[in-house]
Amino acid sequence: MAITMKTLIAYVFTVLLIISSVHCRMTTTTSPGFGIKQQDRQCFEHAPYLCRGGEGDCRMYCRDLDFSFGTCFSGVCCCQI
C-alpha cells in the first residue's frame, strides 16, 4: 500500500500538533520553580505592628495561628496557608 501525499501531510500535521500540545501544556503548581501563590497566603493588614521590628513577630504570630510560617510583604504580615 502506497502512502499518498494527503496521508503523509495529514500524518505530519498530526505529529506537529501532538508535539506542540505536549510542549506548551500548562505547568502545575507542583512544578519546580513556583513560589508562593497569592491564594496560598493569608495577609493581616489590620496588624502592621507585626512587621515593624522585623519578621520575628510575624513568624511567631503565624505559628500561633497554626500556619506554616510568616513573612512580611510590603510591611504587612502574611502567613503561608
UniProtKB/Swiss-Prot annotation:
GO BP field: defense response to fungus; killing of cells of another organism
Signal sequence, renumbered to the chain: 1-24
Annotated S-S bridges: C43-C79, C51-C72, C58-C77, C62-C78
Transmembrane segments: none
One cellular component (GO) term of this entry: extracellular region
Localization in the cell: Secreted
Keyword set, alphabetical order: Antimicrobial, Disulfide bond, Fungicide, Plant defense, Secreted, Signal
Major localization listed first in the record, in broad terms: secreted
Record family assignment: Belongs to the DEFL family.
Protein name: Defensin-like protein 107
Organism: Arabidopsis thaliana (Mouse-ear cress)
